[in-house]
Structures are given as C-alpha cells and as structure tokens.
Design a protein with these regions (language model features):
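A composition/biophysics-driven feature that prefers long, compositionally simple stretches
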Residues: 1-179
C-alpha cells in the first residue's frame, strides 16, 4: 500500500472534520459496442485517494470512526468475471493491498451509507455525476433525516466535495513542480 494515498486521506479527513463524511464513487465502465467496453479508467478523485482501479466501487471516509475511517464498497470476487475482465481484489484483497479498514459489497451501499450518516452533520459528495449514485445517496440521506425525531445527530446538508479535493490536488501538483 502506498503511504501517499493514506496521507491524502488523512488530509481530507482533517478538512471535513469528525462531524463530516465524504463519499467518492469511481467511474462506471463505458460500452463501446454491444459486448465490448472501452478500456476502464477510474474516476480521478477516487483514484487520488485510494489507488484502486476497479469499476463499481465507492470510497467512504468517516473520520473518527471506531472501526476505521477508510471504507470501500465494491464488487465481490467472481471467477467468471475475472476470466473476461481480469483480476478482482474482492472484499479481502482490497483491505490487504490498499489499506482499507472495512469493505462491503456494493449491493449493500445504501444500508452502509444510512448507518454511517448517523452522528454526522455534513455529507461531502459531488452531485450530478451519476444518477444511480445520486439516488442511492439521497435515499440514505433522506432515510436518516426521516428518523431524526428519534433523537441523535443526523446530516443537515450535502456539501460539494470537488472544491476540497481539487484544492488538494492543485497543491500536490504545485509542490511537485517546484522541485
């Protein structure tokens, strides 16, 4: 595991604070022609924090969490898919090779988000890039807010993540160019 990715996550965690949570999905595969996909390229922001380059994955950063702040939801290993698309890390491989604290199946994303939103005041996410991801996040956000009457802290806002991430990436680029 590259320590640079870990350092970037620590910086982002400081920026969003212990009352915030960041959600960063990766890019989807793009169909080229019926059963042929374009070569896969992960979302730049997702890769900047994880170093992980499989499709159908979401990084969640929840600072101060007892079970670890770095969570990834991804596809489970599938031998048939690996024949066509190549090696898959799977739930255990992503923990071992990328320093993930906890990993879950991507199918459980809404449930995971709903539980992680409890006790947080702000959700950092970039809306408008993926309708399916937007709907999943908004459903979890609204489910948690609907249960607010039971007490406890729940998110009151969704803030754009891009300005924070791009400021970090700009500074990283600047320091690389100064050498």
């Amino acid at each position: 595991m590259n320590k640079e990715f870990e350092k970037r996550r620590r910086v982002l965690a400081k920026m969003i604070g212990k009352d915030g949570i960041a959600v960063i999905p990766t890019a989807k595969t793009r169909v080229r022609s019926r059963d042929t996909d374009y070569p896969y390229r992960p979302d730049s922001d997702f890769y900047y924090f994880t170093g992980f380059s499989e499709p159908d994955a979401v990084m969640i950063l929840a600072p101060g969490r007892e079970d670890g702040a770095f969570i990834v939801c991804l596809r489970a290993k599938n031998p048939v898919t690996e024949i066509w698309d190549g090696h898959m890390e799977g739930l255990n491989g992503v923990k071992k090779n990328f320093g993930v604290d906890q990993s879950f199946k991507i199918q459980d994303l809404e449930t995971i988000l709903t539980s992680l939103f409890l006790g947080r005041q702000k959700v950092f996410f970039t809306l408008g890039q993926d309708d399916v991801m937007d709907k999943a996040l908004m459903k979890s956000f609204n489910d948690v807010r609907a249960g607010q009457r039971r007490g406890g802290v729940v998110p009151s806002e969704i803030q754009a993540l891009e300005p924070l991430v791009h400021e970090m990436r700009l500074k990283s680029f600047f320091f690389l160019c100064v050498d």
